[in-house]
Amino acid sequence: MTELNEEATVNEIEQEVQEQQEQVSIPHIPPRPTRHSPPAIDPDQSTSTSNSTNHPVIPQRPTSRPTKSQESKIPQQETPQETQELSSSGKDESDSSAKQNFEIPVIPTRPSRQHSEEPIIPPRPQRTTSQEPVIPIRPESTKSHEDKEEKPISEPVIPSRPKSKSNKPVAPSRPESSKSVEPEVPARPTRDHLTEPEVPLRPVSSREEAKEGLDNLIDQLEKDLSETVEPSVHAPIEDEDESPIEPVPSASGLRLPSEVDQQQESEIQEETNAIAEGQLNSETINSSNTFGDGEVTPGNSTTKTSFKSDEDEDDEHANHLGTGGDSSSFDDDVETISQEQEDHLEEEQQQEQQQEQEQEQERAAPVVQSLGTAIEEDDQAGGDETDTERAEAPAEEPVKEEPVKEEPVKEEPVKEEPVKEGLIKQESKPVIPVIPSRPPKKASLSRSTTEEDSIGLDQSKPNINKPIIPKRPTTESLKSGDESTSSQTQQPSIPVRPTKSNSSTSSGSSETVTKSKPPPPKPKKLSSKIAAFQQQLFNPMKSGSSADEDENKGEGEQPKPRKAVDSSKFLSRFGGNAIPLPGMFNPGQIPMHARPSSTTKDDDNDDDKEEQGSSRSVENAPVRRTRGPRGKKLPKAVSEAKVESESKFCLESGELFGLVFTKKVEESVDGLNEEEVAHKSLEEEVTEVNVKPEVASKTVEKQEEEDDIIDEYEKDDDIVEKDEPKSENDVAKEEVIEAKIDESVTVPGEFKEDTKEEEEEKEEEPVHRIAVSTDSRESPIEEEEDDDIVIDKTGEEKLNSSNSSLVDVKQEMEDELSKNDEML
């Protein structure tokens, strides 16, 4: 099609070009030289300007424009071409014509490309036309349904069902099941004689054709035998063939011709002579073609065609001897003919049986339909109708889905009919109780689909349409009629929610709910993220607070106004409320959870009242609680677990040290010995602590006591005394004291609690406490059990007499104290 369209367009263009060339346009000759030579005739120039403007512009533009407008513009482009060919008077004209002649082939090539694109248009409507016939098929199907709906109303129910069966393509599958039943039922042709007056034409036509076919076969066989066999031998065979073959059509499927063939073979073997195999083979092939089952081949037949060499030798021996040596090959050919006859007879009998079965089915169909209608009427009274039976009733509107269900359901009983008819011999009265057992099978299929549809279809026609159209507006109209006042005040987008709440609550509470919650304002669409951030900064809680205030006002509760809060309290809380920068929120814009609670009692009372009011408002508000998973409980070991927090540190209490304050005892003048006074002073000043500390060691007490002793020495040093002249005895005494000090005299029970390592370190320079007696300078140093040593004043004065000795003692004491501090 595309090539034809292109050729047609090219031919049209060529014709137009030829017509334009024939028409000579003389006044267009002068304008072309005017382009190159401006001095020319004035009247001609006026025409040349108009034409010159058209020549360069017109031929170039239509090439780029669409194809539809090219045909109208092609003559305008080619009119100057005609003038160029005719004008050959001047050199300027020849130059201009040559230039334009180069431009001429460019113009037709472009439309040719565009014309090649044009045939793309026609196949598109062809595609649409291929889709168009899909549309009219659907209204035709609806018309066919309407015709079917109208027919059961006016006509009886019986003729409608055979039409549906005649349209079914499932009919050829039924005789396949009947073939397996054929050998079990040999007497079916006798039944047809009982039902012949109902449909007399169909069985007669089939039997007559079968008889004619058999007669033709017999005649052909006789002719074949007459050609092959001598006339003297053939005469008695005809008489024998006629008598047994005549009653063959009366036999209802029994293989009678096999016996006749055996008789023929026995007589022919006795009377006939040898005949060439080529004639028999050619005749059998010709006879087989008349049967209509295809040519007989070596694989198809049982002839001995593979043994030609042996058979040729047998023929030669037979000819020389004059005996019937080739009788075996002739017998084989006769057997093949008889087998083919038997096969054809079997096939014809099967076809007859199939036709008879179809006729019986068609005859039984109206009976089944009449019985089905009677059963349906009984079912309608009992209320056990099915969808398929309802579609067959005349006074009901059929549904589109029902005819689809009829086809597979009806196939099942039809397949069962030929088996039952073979056993019952097509008796009308006893068949009636057998058929009503089938509707429950149909009902079992339909009950699984829907029982509600079956109940709804039992009613009249308007009941089918009522639940679809009128009921839905009635449900909405009742709700809208009861609540017209509430729905009118609200916006059209929110009328559905109050209806649901009103259905659960009373009519009085519905009015309060509608007034309490007006529709929330729609948020504005922000143009950028910056605007959204600014809105969060400057208006963080206005929307939420305003909504809460509206709820409280609607419920009739007016909470007390809150007192002004100092800004200093907010500043004190900025650090701990997860606010990034101080001063980001103004005092009024801080979230509710960040506001501190007041410290005064009055403020606490006010807050309690406000909390009670807010709790009541929250309880009254319809807020849904979030619920966890139901039916899942924690185990008792987890739910009833008791956690006991135990600290790592143990607390122990005990007395570390004790202090006793006593007055100093003055020196007695009553003549008491100085030794007794010294013992008394030691007992009074120092007292043991009865309760020993449990944890602390005695080293602390020792350090404190040593510090006290050093302080006393320092106080004594402040007092300046006159140096007395030392005697030899005094110097000797001081040396003895220094020697004794150097000796490591340990006090018993002093370092018992120290560890071994500390004792080893202290062996070099242990701490010593010295008590100096006043009377006898040569007395040894007294060791006391109380671990505390007191030096008398007389001993101190003697020790202080020499500055050098005192300085040495002080240095030793300080060194020992420093070592003890380091050890501790």
Curated annotation (Swiss-Prot):
Low complexity bias locations: 75-89, 499-516
Signal sequence annotation: none
Cytoplasm in keyword set: yes
Localization, UniProt: Cytoplasm, Cytoskeleton, Actin patch
One annotated Gene Ontology cellular component of this protein: actin cortical patch
Keyword Cytoplasm recorded: yes
Ranges of biased composition (kind: Basic and acidic residues): 140-153, 205-226, 388-428, 553-566, 722-743, 790-799, 809-824
Acidic residues: bias regions: 343-359, 375-387, 703-721
Biased composition (Polar residues): 44-74, 279-291, 533-546
Keywords recorded for this protein, A-Z: Cytoplasm, Cytoskeleton
Main location as per UniProt: cytoplasm
Region feature (Disordered): 15-645, 694-824
Residue ranges, compositional bias (Basic residues): 624-635
Domain of life, source organism: Eukaryota
Family: Belongs to the AIM21 family.
Function: Involved in mitochondrial migration along actin filaments.
Name of the protein described by the UniProt record: Altered inheritance of mitochondria protein 21
Source species: Candida tropicalis (strain ATCC MYA-3404 / T1)
